[in-house]
Amino acid sequence: MIRSTQYTLNARLYERLPRRTFLPFACLLLALTSVAAQSEQAHTKDISGTWVAKTQTPMGDLEIVYELKVQNGRITGTQRLPFGDAPIVASKFDGDRFELTIELESFGDTQKATAKGKIVGDTLEIAPAFPKPPEGAGGPGGAPPAMFSSSMVFHRGKPTPSNRAPAVDYNSLPKIQLPALHSVLYNGLAATPPMGWNSWNKFHTNITDRTIREIANAMASSGMRDAGYQYLIIDDGWQGQRDDSGRLQPNSNFPDMKALADYVHSKGLKLGIYSSPGPRTCGGFEGSYGQEEMDAKTWAAWGIDYLKYDWCSASRVWKDRQMQAVYQRMGDALRATGRQIVFALCQYGRANVGDWGASVGANSWRTTGDISDSWVSMSSIGFSQSSWAPFARPGHWNDPDMLEVGNGGMSTTEYRTHFTLWAILAAPLIAGNDLRNMSPEIMGILTKKEVIAVNQDKLGRAGERLSKNGDVEVWVRSLDAGAYAVAFFNRGLTPAPGSLRWTSLEIDHTPKVRDLWQHVDVPSSADGFTVSVPGHDVVLIRVSP
């Protein structure tokens, strides 16, 4: 039971009590109030300060910090995660146990979660609060929630020095005047879905200049660049602080961003970067709030070619109905630099972005929450995309998040399905594995020429689900020159047949059929095509008139 120290003497009770009875009774109430308050203070008075816990996870070393302040029987402060800071907005006590209500940012929204803890000697045992991911997304930054389900032991101490920005007081944040809505002129880029590599899925915020240069080398030497992957995108974690003029500087892990861009360009590649329209990024680094023009000019001067712009803390400042105007601010700023920079929105499919994404100058927009490296996450995201198809067109693409191919959470068969589905969807092909250490099988998936050709087809139509029979789904994408890409997906665990009648494609003759993964022409009947599909696998064919 959670203790409350608020005691009220009922006036009617006072009137009914004899005078000689009331005084001892009132004294007893006052004593109980004092004892309860002292009891709470005894349990909480020693936990003010900084508490640190560290553990190892599949994402790397994880450090969580609590900055706590106890006053008048309440705990206030901040929970600091690798994904950013979150304020403690309420607390409860029960003996040596306590609960902290944390206000978290999750995929562009705010939500409250509970961190439960107890005092154990000179330590605190706390099960930290993490944002609940969208269904199928897996967890913070693509990490399984189960990873964080147990308590951690916190000791008093100093956190590891970080480049993250200080916590923001959102109540005193300067207000920004949003512009009247208008159409930002198309930048002429991304005539086909962008292809590249992004640091987040594999490295999260643990990135350096050296890592990016090594990835650039790998993209150039492995065949990735020659297969069409041209954008090397530095995700969250590169930012330092702003100088006296307000110009955002990279942190010490990136001593010279212009030199890094020059190096990436020398490899025949283009460099991308990451920011947020909010005061802080998802990782707690400096965002572009109120500094859109200056940041755009800075990136252009560095030689940046791609911007991923993540909603994150913007949800604490604006409503979804204001999202279009917020993104338009950066669209205008990028356009004003005169440099061609791909503009990729990351707003998790919210606010009917398909209706207005192109008008703010965006070349792509996210349609979902974050993906994680699992069949459940990938399939729940990928197979939910059919309704987005009408919004895709040359220069403007639906983005169901980055590829997890090669990160180890799925089988080679499942990664082949993942890659095929993204190709059919006309989604950006942004790899996220460690390109320095790729198996031949993973390399074969990511560089499969005929599958990439489906993704990059110049007609620019996104695929849609044609039929579903049990575990087997048939997806079709219209291609240039009257051809079709047809994918037979088996979402079940055991082999199952997939079939297609040519009349469903308005074909009245026997067309030419090619298996794109097997790289062979295959026979077909005059009526249609039937194939057995192994569990969690796919058969992808090109149907030509």
Q: Model regions: which residues?
A:
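Bacterial N-terminal signal peptides
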Residues: 23-33
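Structural recognition of the beta-strand scaffold that forms the well-ordered cores
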Residues: 193-199, 228-235, 270-275, 305-310, ...
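Aromatic-lined carbohydrate-recognition surfaces of secreted/lumenal glycan-active proteins
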Residues: 269-286, 331, 335-352
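Carbohydrate-binding surface patches
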Residues: 422-425, 430-432, 468-507, 536
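Central antiparallel beta-sheet cores of small beta-barrel/beta-sandwich binding domains
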Residues: 38-148
